[in-house]
């Protein structure tokens, strides 16, 4: 159900839906007469103005675009808004316009960069912007706006709103006397017009942030999560004052409002069942992984918006995503040097204060825009696998005096409902202290899960970007010249020394002859250039009064340390000018591909991660933790014979050798410690019988390490280290380590060694044949050896009886976490299904016993598990391997359905393999007993949900066959068939609902046919629904597969699966273990109650 007042429901003030629609229709102009009436009202005067918009369709390229006179029917200025200038910014990069009534100037610049989407390299920039100076007929009015589109038709929506919003604002009858009311009305009218337009805004729309300057007063209107920020001088500091507060579910007031309108507010983890949907799990310091709360209709998996207000989004509007803007009215003072308007792509990883600090470092707004966009771009690639579209406008306020006329009275403009969200400020009061109870969310500083997966793949597979071999060996002078040019360049300022060296190696030498065109206006460049010698001129053909006029805008020389083309490193937007060689010269070129490779693969950081992973003491850290540690490393260089540590010093940190070798001398008594594995590995058999106190010398080479004991606070003396040849080390001190990830506890020796030995044992171990002895086993009888997989409240690992060697698998639930998450009923349901309903088979292992202790409730399984299927999918599997896994799963689902159970667990994270390579199903958390009815419960891995689940229509057994199709596609292609919900949820929703399917890799025709039939949108026609599981088994793709042999575990497991399991067990880290020491072991009566049935 939706909210009847959702179009005007703001805070505690609501107007009826009928009144809202009536008011909007009265204000909406007739579509057909807009242009004709506006054209008739055009009267040219002599005042030059600047109008810039992000679309260049029908643009007029002219230095003198004349403002229009006022007409009685309020149509003045409309025509001019569609005739925007595409001319270039002047050489200083900014536009200057006067505000005559207050005798000051606005100096502005802008930059809009299309995002980088690896799976959609040609995706349009969905951001748009508008700058109109002046705005309308009054030279005191100036308009700046940023519009961030989203959804399949987001680009069209943002362009539509950019044009219509300005028109509606100028047309409003109270624009001259009450700009705040006019802004509110313009947003609502534009929203209604977008609904009525041919553009499909059902699952698409745009956020909007606009700033209108009138004299010394600015009116800020915001709908969404873009932002406007004002700089203010306070006590010698420059402080960021947020003029808008992001409208997202992070705000308690917005969260409550959309819930009253019928929205479900959940993160993707909650949607997928990884976290309790009844517990608010966002807004804490721990939740910084790019999984924000989103809005969903009551019984559907859409629309999934992460904001609570926007223009368009007609479906989201039914659950409270309204177009009503929040409006702030602020009076400028001489203490306000500039303001910034930007899309949320800027503020995802950069705070408002950081933006203000960066702008303050640049005299020219253009340079500030470029610096902020480049830093945003860099941070997106550091923490994500893609970047958002990024748009920014910077406006400097020059020459404003205290004696300038004031336009607000001391009491401010009094505004009545239905426009309550108006904040009026004077001086230094910010919205957050003037009745705004919310603050903008802190920026993200953790890697996204997609980024973590990409790093893991790079570490496992070696698919990291590799720099090209330089065709020309640079001289010392050439490298020094390039370094001087790049030293203070905004785009390269944050690169590490190692990255800078790689960048130097990537720059290729180009020779240019007089008259050669290096880059051509209108073309697409992909290189950044540093001028090595010679002279180059910048040419642009611009429209003048007498037609096209070529102009020389600038000259580049090596003496000026010139460079150009930096924006080509970030996008392929058509070039605004040509560059031509005046005489013979040389250029150093850096390709976009190489620049992006340096940033995305984090070349030096990836090497650091590999080095850190080799340290036994750090082997249990996650990729995210290792990444934080890698950022804390420092580099130290030593010459041949230089002493790194003397015997009277104590080593202060971990040293990892990147280059060269070192000689370490120490007394054998040092080896008595458990945490000196780096020294013991270098000791040969001849030293085994040496007496305590004997001095030993060993050598450590590139890739080795020493000093790990210092991370635990152990200080060893009687040890010296000397460089042999030139040596480069990275150093990690205890203080830096603990600052990055916290204290490192002393890890015992049951980690990787146990994991490896368990694999060796598994070759001989088989299922327990005599199960009677284990029927009454307790957790005290079992010894936990290895953790294989974890969820929010459980973990699966290997155990053995303390007097036996046979390895078994244990699924244990943390009693404390189950209670905290409110999952008692879910856990009991899963246990009952596994123990009492589902019959054991070759694929569903037998339950040997269930047991409980003070900390855990556990299920002992008669199988020796190896890993989840996801651990093997660092690259696509071959078809024979996928066929084997799929055949096993089809047999299992067939048996599960016979027991009237809907599985909903066909994802590689939930499905396990045993150490023989056979599929094992041990996770039934999403399973449900059906009795012929449909279920409307939404759960399961979001990427595997069927269209009927996404659309909230209810679902049955056919949903399992859809998920099977998704799984087959993923195992063969290495990517999801409809994109990942974590990267573009709206696009994925629509693709699932429409069944839009493509095959990037060439598969067999049989495989494509089976996948296509399983991924049929109509569940009645879906393979498996018609003809049952037998129709799937008889598909030609399964020809040669012996179903009975699979059921009897007699089918030969494909070698590809065996080899990948071997590789995983030999090389991958075990997961961090949950021990009883980390949990509250206090007995809880409630816990005992729900466990009585265990």
UniProtKB/Swiss-Prot annotation:
**To which protein family does this belong?**
In the N-terminal section; belongs to the PP2C family. In the C-terminal section; belongs to the protein kinase superfamily. AGC Ser/Thr protein kinase family.
Q: Which Pfam families match?
A: cNMP_binding, Pkinase, PP2C
Report the superkingdom from the record. Answer: Eukaryota
Q: Which PANTHER family match?
A: CYCLIC NUCLEOTIDE-DEPENDENT PROTEIN KINASE (PTHR24353), PROTEIN PHOSPHATASE 2C AND CYCLIC NUCLEOTIDE-BINDING_KINASE DOMAIN-CONTAINING PROTEIN (PTHR24353:SF127)
> One cellular component GO annotation, for this chain's record?
cAMP-dependent protein kinase complex
* Amino-acid positions noted as binding a nucleoside 3',5'-cyclic phosphate 1 in the UniProt annotation, renumbered to this chain: 491-616
| Gene Ontology molecular function terms on file | ATP binding; cAMP-dependent protein kinase activity; metal ion binding; protein serine/threonine phosphatase activity
The name this protein carries in UniProt is Protein phosphatase 2C and cyclic nucleotide-binding/kinase domain-containing protein
Keywords attached to this Swiss-Prot or TrEMBL record, sorted alphabetically, are: ATP-binding, Hydrolase, Kinase, Magnesium, Manganese, Metal-binding, Nucleotide-binding, Protein phosphatase, Repeat, Serine/threonine-protein kinase, Transferase
- Segments forming domain Protein kinase: 785-1038
Q: Which residues take part in binding a nucleoside 3',5'-cyclic phosphate 2?
A: 617-758
What does the record give as the organism's lineage? Eukaryota, Viridiplantae, Streptophyta, Embryophyta, Tracheophyta
**So what EC number does this one have?**
3.1.3.16
PPM-type phosphatase domain: residues covered: 107-397
Domain comment from the record reads as follows: The protein kinase domain is predicted to be catalytically inactive.
